[in-house]
From Swiss-Prot:
Family from the record: Belongs to the class-II aminoacyl-tRNA synthetase family.
Organism taxonomic ancestry: Bacteria, Pseudomonadati, Chlamydiota, Chlamydiia, Parachlamydiales
Keywords: Aminoacyl-tRNA synthetase, ATP-binding, Cytoplasm, Ligase, Metal-binding, Nucleotide-binding, Protein biosynthesis, RNA-binding, tRNA-binding, Zinc
Organism: Protochlamydia amoebophila (strain UWE25)
EC number: 6.1.1.3
Domain TGS per the UniProt entry, residue ranges: 5-67
Pfam families per record: HGTP_anticodon (PF03129), TGS (PF02824), tRNA-synt_2b (PF00587), tRNA_SAD (PF07973)
Protein name per its UniProtKB record: Threonine--tRNA ligase
Reactions catalysed according to its record: tRNA(Thr) + L-threonine + ATP = L-threonyl-tRNA(Thr) + AMP + diphosphate + H(+)
Binding partners and assembly: Homodimer.
Localisation: Cytoplasm
PROSITE patterns, per database record: AA_TRNA_LIGASE_II, TGS
Length: 650
């Protein structure tokens, strides 16, 4: 490759080399590549570090440009939008004191002291934000020389000063300036404000400074912004759809679960909900059996000494429920892992036994502040479909492939697509040697490459004990949920001194994978309620078939049929009330019965039933034996869609 001495070569995401003039910035590269739409560059990663587009490039740099379709791009976009919000608030309420304003999963927020507003102020604030954006300020990053300089610059804001004092003395402090607004911030940010085309304030809330209930209550403003007005319109539509799918409302309406003040954050699963629950557990157990897992059950409460070995007592105690029995400290398990380590140690192991796949559907308890509890999504008591796989280092890639295949099979059954993220070694405070991390990361990456699914790399975002793969599933309205995880753990086998005998007779430390696919079964149940809008496929449904009688004389035949369907393994109900047929049909549809069978004089005479679906697809008279056979196939194959979804299939 020929080059002149005033140019340099950098590497793009696809590892191809690209020639740029010496002294170029990431923005120069973005301008040259001229990416458009959701791929238009908002920021960059250079050698794994996320930076502003103004960042200078050097010979050999590995450069990835982030657009709004990337999580990194959204984070940069929303972080800058938070600064626009703070600037607007200060223009309108000069005595307000900005504290922190981070991007979050959907948009951003900013917390303010000395500010009282209501929803009635939103229009005024949005108008001021639009005015600031129209000024199209270039955003400038400024390095602050010392902590004392930073304290001087923010001397009138005690919240910023508290943050500054919490940093280590050698930390590099930076500020960002747009017009008259200047904020203490590590960045990165947009190059200018012109990229922000649409925004909306969502709500206000109270928030304690730094999340500490002993500190001041601040005013938090939530908002969201987009580089395109249509994206905002689509997002607001998605919010309306999400309201219809709220699992808390549907859970009550369909009598699936409830939450009681007497047990905050600990769900009561009702009979109908337990039918769904049991099907989920039976399904995953079936999958585990086919993939050669064994299953164990470990105690719910174990001694302090165990949690000291695992590190939970020192690092996680504030999130544990602790009790004292006979002068000994016990903790209810917040995780299943330490119990599995004890099970592994209860036997001696040979390399011939490995890989050893051990599953547990364990009930764990974690303290969560009452204000953070939310339906089935954020609870204090939940079940995890955990598994720990013990193996030789040479097994890593093949075992990861096996877990990836298992997860793909399970998510596909529910009609859930997903994306994958590989998180690599953090810069500081990790255990294990460089070689161990290289082998572990190469194993995970090799498995992902072999699987052939697209994935993204989160540089430095792994756990201190090993790299990990996360599954982000997408539901029916395209919301993303982090569910499954595959974590390679180099810490617990060391802490518990786990061993196996190698072929040469030496005792060696196994490599361990921690994996979960549902994650929290309660949370996954909640996701499915919203994904299906309560309309569970037949195999999961707690309300499969309802018989409706036209008159009292039809009840004996309806109950005879109901018994046949129950004997065939279906959940059946008979409505023989005095309501009109149309009202009974409507009630059955609202209760989300998959199939509604009406019995009248003709059906009694012909020994048939009149079929319609919960979506009001009417099929008329059907033969009972044939219908049962079709439903058995639908249930056994765990079909997502009913063969009776359209009238043409009759």
């Amino acid at each position: 490759m020929i080059r002149n001495n005033k140019s340099m070569f950098i590497k793009l995401k696809d590892q191809s080399s690209y020639e740029m003039p010496s002294g170029s910035t990431a923005k120069d590269l973005a301008d040259k590549l001229n990416l458009k739409g959701p791929h238009e560059a908002l920021g960059a990663s250079i050698n794994g570090k996320t930076v502003d587009l103004s960042y200078p490039l050097q010979e050999g740099d590995q450069v990835i440009l982030w657009g709004f379709n990337d999580p990194e791009g959204k984070e940069i976009f929303w972080h800058t939008s938070a600064h626009v919000l703070a600037q607007a608030i200060l223009r309108l309420w000069p005595d307000a004191q900005p504290t922190i304003g981070p991007p979050i999963e959907n948009g951003f927020y900013y917390d303010f002291a000395n500010l009282t507003i209501s929803d009635a102020d939103f229009e005024k604030i949005e108008k001021e934000m639009q005015a600031i954006i129209s000024e199209n300020f270039q955003i400038k990053r400024e390095v602050i020389s010392t902590k004392s300089d930073a304290l001087k610059q923010f001397q009138n804001n005690p919240y910023k000063c508290e943050l500054i004092n919490s940093f280590e003395d050698e930390s590099t402090l930076t500020g960002y300036r747009q017009g008259e607004f200047y904020d203490l911030c590590r960045g990165p940010h947009l190059f200018n404000l012109g990229k922000i085309k649409a925004l909306k304030l969502m709500k206000t809330a109270g928030a304690y400074w730094r999340g500490d209930s002993n500190k001041e209550m601040l005013t938090r403003i939530y908002a969201i912004s987009f580089p395109d007005r249509k994206l905002l319109k689509d997002y607001l539509h998605q919010l309306e759809e999400a309201k219809k799918r709220d699992h808390k409302l549907l859970g009550a309406k369909l009598d699936l679960f409830s939450l009681k003040e007497e047990a905050p954050g600990m769900p009561f699963i009702h009979p109908k909900g337990l039918i769904v629950w049991n099907q989920l557990v039976a399904y995953i157990r079936e999958c585990l059996s086919r993939h050669d897992y064994i299953e164990i059950k470990t105690p719910t409460m174990m001694t302090k000494e165990l949690w000291e070995i695992s590190g939970h007592w020192g690092n996680y105690r504030q999130n544990m429920f602790i009790s004292q029995i006979e002068d000994r400290d016990f903790a209810i398990k917040p995780m299943n892992c330490p119990g599995c380590m004890l099970y592994y140690k209860s036997h001696t192991h040979s390399y011939r036994e490995l890989p050893l796949r051990i599953a547990e559907i364990g009930n764990v308890h974690r303290y969560e502040p009452s204000g953070s509890l939310s339906g089935l999504f954020r609870v204090r008591s939940f079940h995890q479909d955990d598994a720990h796989i013990f193996m030789k280092p040479s097994d890593i890639q093949q075992e990861i492939l096996g877990v990836l295949a298992l997860a793909d099979e399970i998510y596909s059954t529910f009609g859930l697509s997903y994306r994958l993220e590989l998180s690599t070694r953090p810069e500081k405070n990790t255990i294990g040697t460089d070689h161990e991390w290289e082998v572990a990361t190469a194993g995970l990456k090799g498995a992902l490459d072999e699987m052939g699914k697209e994935y993204r790399i989160n540089e430095g975002d792994g756990a201190f004990y090993g790299p990990k793969i996360d599954f982000h599933i997408r539901d029916a309205i395209n919301r993303s949920w982090q569910c499954g995880t595959i974590q390679l753990d180099m810490a617990l086998p060391e802490k518990f001194e786990l061993e196996y005998t190698f072929s040469d007779g030496t005792r060696q430390r196994p490599v361990m994978i921690h994996r979960a696919i549902f994650g929290s079964i309660e949370r996954f149940f909640g996701i499915l309620i919203e994904h299906y809008v309560g309309k569970f496929p037949l195999w999961l449904s707690p309300s499969q078939i309802r018989f409706i009688t036209v008159a009292d004389r039809h009840e004996p035949y309806a109950r005879e049929l109901a018994k046949r369907f129950k004997n065939a393994g279906f959940h059946v109900d008979v409505d023989s009330t005095q309501e009109s047929v149309s009202k009974k049909v409507r009630n059955a549809q609202l209760a989300q019965f998959n199939y509604i069978l009406t019995i009248g004089d003709q059906e009694v005479e012909h020994k048939t039933a009149n079929l319609r679906t919960r979506d009001n697809v009417v099929h008329g008279e059907i033969q009972i034996d044939e219908f049962i056979q079709k439903l058995e196939i639908e249930k056994q194959q765990r079909q997502s869609h009913s063969p009776y979804a359209s009238a043409e299939r009759n």
